[in-house]
Amino acid sequence: MTSQFVPHRPHPALRGLVTGALGYRQEGLPPGTHRGLPSPALTLVVTLDGSLDVAAHPDRAQAPGRYDALLGGLHTTPALIRHPGRQTGLQLALSPLGARRLLGVPAGELAALDVDLADVLGGTELVDRVREAASWPARFAAAEDVLRRVAGHGTPPAEVAEAWRLTLAGGGRLRVAEIARRVGWSERHLTARFRAETGLGPKEAARVVRFDRARRALAARPRPDLAALAAAAGYADQAHLTREWRAFTGLSPLRWLAAEFGFVQDGGDRDAAGSAA
């Protein structure tokens, strides 16, 4: 098996709109299913070796589909993506607060949906240019050039933007009541406006932010200590972490780690009291 992951710092002109970028190439894998997990960003994927075969979308009512380029909204359940043993493509993380400028619609209109990128951008220029480029730097530059040109001037309400900032900065730990107090809105009004703009309610967003941070921390540890991870991420206990992990991935933390990376060196750690991975 060969794997290549190429991180890229987004162009300064896209600051606040594109929060991350990655090129990836994996070959020699056994055919299987990749889980597209919830995160605090919309996901833009351009494939370079065929199409993306989505067997199940976050909204299970959406029919399976194949995409040359896909845009996924914020969600709380995993997408299931079949692959034939190889995966090559470019992935961008888009801030939900930048959706109006980049896509012409609020991220709330894309909640739990996967859509063909061409349907949102109004054409295939981004996909065509990325696929024509011969190197990772050229591919990133091509995608960013198109996004810089299509970016408009729409912005979310300042109160929603501040609520999102507080959710990220607090790692999902701030209560909705406290966020509402800080932005000067009632909880009910904040929840409605926040969901319309991002696709998630404030409580859901906090859960996703907390999970995303825990996922990154777990992926970086060859010998995971789930109890310590739960405490650091703001979960009540290890059992709480495991429940949330199952809700977002369909697997326990250690089973997810084994499925994603092929091995787990857990030194006897268990997913939750009385429950092996």
Go through each PLM region and give its residues.
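DNA major-groove recognition helix of helix-turn-helix
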Residues: 194, 206, 244-246, 257
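Alpha-helical bundle regulatory/interaction domains
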Residues: 1-187, 197-202, 216-221, 225-236, ...
